[in-house]
A protein has these predicted regions:
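Residues in the recognition helix of alpha-helical DNA-binding motifs
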Residues: 9, 23, 34
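Acidic-residue sensor for enzyme active/binding pockets
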Residues: 17-19, 35, 45
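DNA major-groove recognition helix of helix-turn-helix/homeodomain DNA-binding modules
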Residues: 40-62
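Short alpha-helical DNA-recognition segment
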Residues: 14-30
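A short, Lys/Arg-rich alpha-helix, primarily the initiator
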Residues: 1-12
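Recognition helix of helix-turn-helix/homeodomain-like DNA-binding domains
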Residues: 26-40
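Short intrinsically disordered terminal tails
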Residues: 1, 60-65
């Protein structure tokens, strides 16, 4: 995942860099640095995808009857 793709996913989740940083246990500066890189560290990518999946599941549960 490129830094641009990471930033796009973060944006689609409607999260700020600070919110992602808090969820991943890193600084906002680290998230900013990742977004400027050609390739995001694999663990950061997996963590963000996991958070996105959790958020999606939570939203789907609230859309039920």
């Amino acid at each position: 995942m490129t830094g641009d793709q990471f930033a796009q996913l973060r944006s689609e989740l409607d999260w700020t860099q600070q919110e992602v940083a808090a969820q991943l246990g890193v600084t906002r500066f680290t998230v900013s640095r990742w977004e400027g890189q050609e390739e995001v560290p694999r663990m950061a990518e997996l963590a963000l995808r996991y958070l996105a999946r959790d958020l999606h599941a939570e939203l789907m549960a609230h859309d039920g009857p």
